[in-house]
Amino acid sequence: DVLGSRGLGDVYKRQVHKDMYSFVRGYEFIGVDSFRKAQPREHAYAAITAFHLYGWYRDNHFCGRCGKPLKHDDKQRMLRCACCKNMVFPKICPAVIVAVTDKDRILLTKYAGRTYRNYALIAGFTEIGETTEETVSREVMEEVGVKVKNITYYKSQPWGLSGSQLLGYFCELDGDDTITLEEDELSVGTWVKADDIDVIDDHISLTREMIEKFRSEHVSHN
């Protein structure tokens, strides 16, 4: 949990135990996922980035090469080992979000075993030696068992909750539309027509932005 004001405008950037600050009036503990809906949007991003940095600092007290303590660099956002000169930069994991489309349909999924229950898009991390376009094809095949073509980059988004840089892609179904779920990852995978997609007011999620972009461009206007 992160300690923040009731208005979410003031964020304390260290993760703490609830009992330590239970006496502070005017504050309450909230889960970091609360920042998905926080406004203004730039404050929400600042809080999520603070959480990302906290995790990096927490996990990097000592040099992974020689074991000596790391120190903050004076000029860069970097940790430096004075002994062996090793430089440690914030961990940022590239990942893709994929909107698979078939004319007026889009492939929507739901995660298995997670608290987030809304529809989402296929997503996954890029492997070493892999282009992000290759990640798109691999993740789609692994999670829902279909092939894709015409992979097109949309936009990116930093996402500190998972320490990621998210890269959004649109692509088209290539062949058979039969879905074979990877049940360890997903509980639902289904084709949904643009007319059947609900408009959700979500100002921070790249996933929701991509779903809404597809819906608005393909919904019938009869």
Question: For the regions a protein language model found, what residue spans apply to each?
Answer:
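Single conserved hydrophobic/aromatic residue that forms the stacking wall/gate
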Residues: D1-Y12
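NUDIX/MutT-family hydrolases
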Residues: M20-Q39, L181-R208
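Short Cys/His-rich Zn2+-coordinating modules
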Residues: P40-A50, H61-K68
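Short, flexible, mixed-charge glycine/proline-rich loop motifs
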Residues: A50-D59, L70-K75
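N-terminal strand-loop-strand
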Residues: H61, K75-L121, F125, K147-V148, ...
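Short functional micro-motifs and their immediate structural scaffolds
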Residues: K68-K71, F89
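Hydrophobic alpha-helical positions that pack around
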Residues: I122, V136, V140
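Active-site-adjacent beta-strand/loop module that shapes the phosphate/pyrophosphate-binding cleft
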Residues: Q157-I179
